[in-house]
Amino acid sequence: MLRKAFLLNLGMLDYNRSRDLQKRLHARRVIDVVPDTVLLVEHPHTITLGRRGNRLCLKASPEDLERMGIPVVQVERGGDVTYHGPGQAVVYPILHLRESGLSLADYVSALESLVIGVLGDFGIKGRRNGKNRGVWVGGDKIASVGIAVSRWVSYHGIALNCTTNLEYFGLIDACGLKGVEMTSISRLLGKDVSGSEVHRSIAFHLRRLFERDWQERTLPEIEALLND
């Protein structure tokens, strides 16, 4: 029998609010109060700095970022600096890796495989880069991965550019890599794609890669479970 797991499509959600939700789910998953849970979310404009993050990778001044209404958040995930914003599909799995039989490397590869599968559904050939994690199309990067794992339970995850305004990546050296060009599904196709199309594809490949009894849940349902 497949183990139960939850899938939540949260739509647009403030970065810090989603981070708090991840931490609460993580704490409950560690003690087996909740099953594996995956959050699908989109964020307002936000820049995050991972454990290797350095503000020298910011090309805009703190004053300019404040004027633009873009917060800079130091977080516990791996990796360097990245941008989140409208038109980006972000996947946050809170999974017990040991129970899943996954090493850290296996898990990151699975996240990359998920995105490569999604891109394939849109006729785009994604690939890994032997030197840098994430997913690439040709020489351009389309998805960034940065995870945190504590007591064998994951949080944070992977962000895929769908209809993202790529100009915002000009505010940073993406993932700490100078000269990296970012791309998106809409840029490669020459047309916009709907968020619902992307989310359906993500859900399909999530089920393909992580065999669970995936059950869709709403935020109020999860909040009730966490507060029980």
Curated annotation (Swiss-Prot):
Domain of life: Bacteria
Pathway given in the UniProt record: Protein modification; protein lipoylation via endogenous pathway; protein N(6)-(lipoyl)lysine from octanoyl-[acyl-carrier-protein]: step 1/2
Transmembrane residue ranges: none
Chaperone found in the keyword field: no
GO BP: protein modification process
Described purpose of this protein according to its UniProt entry: Catalyzes the transfer of endogenously produced octanoic acid from octanoyl-acyl-carrier-protein onto the lipoyl domains of lipoate-dependent enzymes. Lipoyl-ACP can also act as a substrate although octanoyl-ACP is likely to be the physiological substrate.
Protein name, per record: Octanoyltransferase
UniProt enzyme class: transferase
Places the protein is found: Cytoplasm
EC number(s) from the headed UniProt entry: 2.3.1.181
GO MF annotation terms: lipoyl(octanoyl) transferase activity
Keyword hit for Transferase: yes
